[in-house]
Amino acid sequence: MGRMIEFIFTRVYLAMLVTGIFWALTFCGGILFGFGPASATIMSLYAEHGSDYKQYAWSEAWSLYKENFRRANQVFYTFFLIEAILIYGMYLMVQLPHLSLFQIFILLVNLIFLLVAPLTFAVYLKLQVHFDLSYLNSLKLSFIGAFLDIRAVTKLLLGTFLLGVVTHFVPALFFFVLLGLWHFFVNDIFQPVYETIRSKVVS
């Protein structure tokens, strides 16, 4: 029981710590240009130090943030732009008085890609920790990785949904704890995806 309590306390404290680092880095980027590199930085810190919260240092976080700033923003806003175009296209289509079967099919395809874009960015967050990728290779490998492990994708969708439910009832947790937990979750569930891609790259 004592070890379980210690484990829970450590995880919650670590989640609060990295969430605080995340928000600080996000504001350093003026929010708009801080979100992507802040997420990439948190993933790198967690991959390096795991649950050893004493090893997390602002100086290292800031250094990683500066390294990640350009590439992470490029990838993040690529997916953001795709999402915006899809949403706007769907908005225009639903304004039509009578939708044909083909138009309904296009709407369904758009809905699928609305899920694929953020999913692919989550895969990118995992892969960028381990690979030094160009912009185009980041997009290609992340997109491929999103389809390599259906179980990981299912876990991500369910886990994100549950965190969303918790946020709905206790919004403060999102700003102080849940963001950190989400990054830990992404790191762990996409480990098989990383290992699969690494085995292909090495071979």
Model regions: which residues?
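Hydrophobic alpha-helical membrane segments
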Residues: 1-137, 141-203
